[in-house]
């Protein structure tokens, strides 16, 4: 069965998606170089689909780039078709020449290409076709050759001569030099939730909580801040370029970099427009460093095993499948920003299918959004399609877009895009083996993903690091022991960046972030959204607390309080003598769609509200019905208007005619508080009257996270624990 978008998915399709499901707009499929004839010549090539599927077959560039030279020599694909036989003969001659003059010929070719960068367009199967991402039968053009891999190692070592194995490198200590007995002890502690916590203050009024497995050993010391890239264990190829784009770390960044590059889990709940690009560059640098070190280790061990064939070497350096990094993002344009960060940090001579990527993933901003808030334009600007997935493959000189998942190093996807490929339409074929060896998982803009369908996030994480159903050409003699023992999820690093933290995100932190190296949660200290109201006159903001015994019963307790204590006064104020309409302009803001349906149905059927006229706008209301409801509300024909948080998230309407605001629950996003209350001032002539009507919000102790952002960290404690009353007013 197809994975539903659900009540959390983006319901509006009018903006964004260029190319629908991400199909290219550059015409039919281009001819691909067929490797079957080459395989006949090189009969020693690996069999059983191992090429390009196993991590052990890491690309050696020499054969690949011979093909690249032929494919990039002409921009006209038709001309390439007409001259098929000639390039093939040339290719064989080059292969034979490479065998006769093995090292020198390839070295010369490397020098010739070092001064130029090329984009190669090789049309791969569509990344959203049913089978394209996961097919093992379609091996890519870059078949790996073990002899060529040996040369790639030699050249790579010359290229990165300063990169030596460092026992203090977190990559070594966390993935390679693992004490199996200590790992098992830590896993047992984590399984029983035996976390020991340390609290710390970061510059800028940020709170940090570090949790690590309490194994009874020495006390864990908080790492010192990192003040520059020189303190990080970076591959030399990255360090040479990163300094051009990542300046000296600021106070907050310097405190978090040691955890990110130390392979500890991180939940960062203070993502903003000003720091989002900095953290994006940092985690892109981190995952690139991880990919390059993983590839370098495999290549060196390949070379070692070839040079010492008689030795019984224990070379444990791989996972079950090649993909090592998963980056989950809300939109295609967000994916473009991440890819741009990657490409500016990793200087590749060639980028295959780059134009196709930008054609299908990027779009111009809507010029009519000049009056929209900055956070809205950042999230929905450009291509806001939330159905996508993309594989990136890295070789020594090339970045390859739209690589098949089992051939990819990094997978970038939306939750829905991943869910669609994991669960096929017929419900019979499931494939998530490509997630079995993920070692770094990144979730960016988690707050935006909450407004899609968070169930897809939970589903994806529940399928990370499972034992694969098929071998996919894996060399099990090279697989790390903690993969074979099913312990990979305790080694995986997870990084989550969000503008704020919700119970759902906290649940992800508790249930899916099991890193034996520890995990860190960072939250800001809030002053309160009630202090930042965009009105020229003071507005009375009242908070009414109701009792709720458990989160499960909270919806029922909230509804009961609303109908008994709030709705009765609303009905009285909205009707005059004889039941005639008297007052209008009440906006009822409802965060949850399920609560919206419940309240709407009650207002439509209850005898208590038979004289109350109202309109309703939700994320599923048609554009025509939205316009009608807004018109009737502004004219006074409707006394009340129901309005959901997700509607405001996706549309940011400016509702006119509001004279009073009732919050059925406070919004998750604190920015929405000021915007909703700001509706009271959209009609200047009635601003003073609207200010008198003010705002009334309902809350319970289970709304603590939301309330902290609205009223401020210092005020929250008294409001939750106050015994003398349940009503709190601020002006």
UniProtKB/Swiss-Prot annotation:
The keyword Nucleus applies. It comes from the Eukaryota. Residues 86-102 have a biased composition (Polar residues). Residues 31-46, 112-125 have a biased composition (Basic and acidic residues). Residues 58-80, 126-169 have a biased composition (Acidic residues). Keywords: Nucleus, Ribonucleoprotein, Ribosome biogenesis, rRNA processing. GO terms for biological process: maturation of SSU-rRNA from tricistronic rRNA transcript (SSU-rRNA, 5.8S rRNA, LSU-rRNA). It is found in: Nucleus, Nucleolus. GO terms for molecular function: rRNA binding; U3 snoRNA binding. One of its GO terms (cellular component) is small-subunit processome. Residues 18-30 have a biased composition (Basic residues). Residues 1-174 are annotated as: Disordered. SUPFAM superfamilies: P-loop containing nucleoside triphosphate hydrolases. DEAD-box RNA helicase-like protein required for pre-18S rRNA processing, specifically at sites A0, A1, and A2. Component of the ribosomal small subunit (SSU) processome composed of at least 40 protein subunits and snoRNA U3. PANTHER family: ORF PROTEIN-RELATED (PTHR12933), U3 SMALL NUCLEOLAR RNA-ASSOCIATED PROTEIN 25 HOMOLOG (PTHR12933:SF0). Belongs to the UTP25 family. This is U3 small nucleolar RNA-associated protein 25. It comes from Ajellomyces dermatitidis (strain ER-3 / ATCC MYA-2586) (Blastomyces dermatitidis). The lineage of its organism: Eukaryota, Fungi, Dikarya, Ascomycota, Pezizomycotina.
């Amino acid at each position: 069965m197809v994975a539903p978008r659900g009540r959390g998915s983006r319901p509006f399709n009018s903006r964004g998606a260029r190319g629908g499901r991400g199909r290219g707009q550059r015409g039919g499929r281009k001819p691909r170089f067929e490797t079957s004839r080459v395989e006949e010549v090189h009969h020693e090539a690996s069999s059983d689909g191992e090429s390009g599927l196993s991590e052990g077959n890491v690309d050696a560039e020499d054969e690949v780039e011979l093909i690249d030279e032929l494919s990039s020599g002409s921009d006209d694909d038709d001309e390439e078709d007409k001259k098929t036989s000639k390039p093939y003969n040339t290719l064989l001659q080059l292969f034979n020449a490479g065998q006769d003059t093995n090292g020198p010929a390839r070295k010369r070719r490397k020098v010739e290409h070092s001064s130029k960068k090329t984009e190669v367009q090789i049309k791969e199967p569509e990344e959203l076709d049913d089978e394209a991402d996961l097919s093992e039968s379609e091996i890519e053009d870059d078949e790996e050759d073990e002899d060529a891999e040996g040369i790639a190692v030699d050249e790579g070592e010359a290229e990165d001569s300063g990169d030596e194995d460092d026992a203090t490198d977190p990559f070594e200590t966390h993935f390679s030099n693992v004490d199996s007995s200590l790992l098992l002890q830590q896993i047992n502690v984590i399984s029983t939730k035996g976390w020991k916590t340390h609290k710390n203050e970061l510059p800028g009024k940020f709170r940090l909580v570090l949790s690590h497995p309490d194994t009874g050993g020495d006390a864990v010391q908080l790492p010192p801040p990192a003040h520059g890239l020189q303190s990080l264990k970076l591959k030399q190829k990255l360090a040479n370029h990163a300094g051009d784009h990542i300046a000296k770390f600021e106070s907050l960044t310097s405190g978090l970099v040691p955890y990110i590059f130390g392979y500890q889990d991180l939940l960062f709940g203070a993502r903003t427009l000003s720091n989002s690009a900095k953290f994006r560059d940092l985690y892109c640098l981190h995952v690139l460093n991880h990919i390059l070190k993983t590839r370098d280790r495999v290549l060196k061990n390949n070379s070692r095993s070839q040079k010492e064939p008689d030795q019984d070497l224990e070379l444990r350096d791989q996972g079950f499948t090649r993909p090592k990094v998963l980056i989950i993002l809300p939109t295609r344009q967000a994916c473009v920003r991440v890819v741009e960060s990657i490409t500016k940090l990793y200087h590749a001579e060639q980028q295959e299918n780059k134009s196709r990527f930008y054609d299908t993933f990027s779009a111009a901003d809507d010029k009519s959004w000049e009056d929209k808030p900055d956070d809205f334009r950042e999230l929905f600007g450009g291509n806001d399609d939330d159905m996508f997935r993309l594989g990136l493959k890295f070789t020594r000189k090339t970045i390859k877009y739209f690589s098949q998942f089992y051939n990819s190093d990094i997978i970038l996807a939306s939750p829905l895009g991943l869910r669609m490929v994991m669960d096929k339409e017929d419900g019979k074929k499931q494939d998530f083996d490509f997630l079995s060896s993920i070692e770094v998982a990144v979730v960016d803009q988690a707050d935006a993903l909450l407004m899609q369908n968070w169930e897809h996030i939970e589903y994806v994480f529940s399928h990370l690091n499972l034992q694969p159903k098929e071998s996919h050409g894996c060399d099990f003699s090279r697989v790390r022991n903690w993969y074979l023992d099913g312990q990979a999820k305790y080694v995986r690093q997870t990084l989550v960046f969000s503008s704020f933290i919700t119970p759902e995100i906290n649940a992800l932190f508790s249930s899916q972030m099991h890193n034996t190296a520890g995990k860190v949660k960072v939250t800001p200290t809030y002053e309160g959204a009630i202090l930042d109201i965009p009105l020229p006159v003071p507005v009375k903001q009242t908070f009414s607390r109701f009792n709720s015994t458990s989160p499960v019963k909270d919806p029922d307790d909230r509804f009961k309080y609303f109908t008994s204590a709030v709705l009765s006064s609303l009905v009285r104020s909205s009707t005059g003598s004889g039941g005639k309409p008297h007052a209008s302009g009440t906006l009822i803001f409802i965060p949850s769609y399920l609560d919206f349906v419940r309240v709407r149905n009650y207002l439509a059927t209850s005898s208590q509200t038979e004289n109350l006229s109202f309109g309703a706008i939700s994320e599923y209301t048609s554009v025509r019905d939205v316009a009608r409801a807004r018109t009737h509300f502004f004219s006074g024909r409707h006394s009340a208007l129901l309005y959901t948080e997700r509607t405001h998230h996706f549309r940011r309407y400016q509702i006119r005619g509001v004279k009073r605001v009732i919050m059925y629950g406070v919004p998750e996003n604190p920015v929405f508080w000021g915007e909703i209350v700001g509706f009271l001032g959209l009609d200047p002539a009635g601003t003073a009257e609207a200010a008198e009507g003010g705002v009334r919000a309902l809350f319970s102790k289970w709304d603590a996270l939301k309330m902290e952002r609205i009223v401020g960290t210092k005020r929250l404690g008294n409001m939750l624990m106050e015994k003398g009353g349940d009503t709190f007013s601020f002006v």
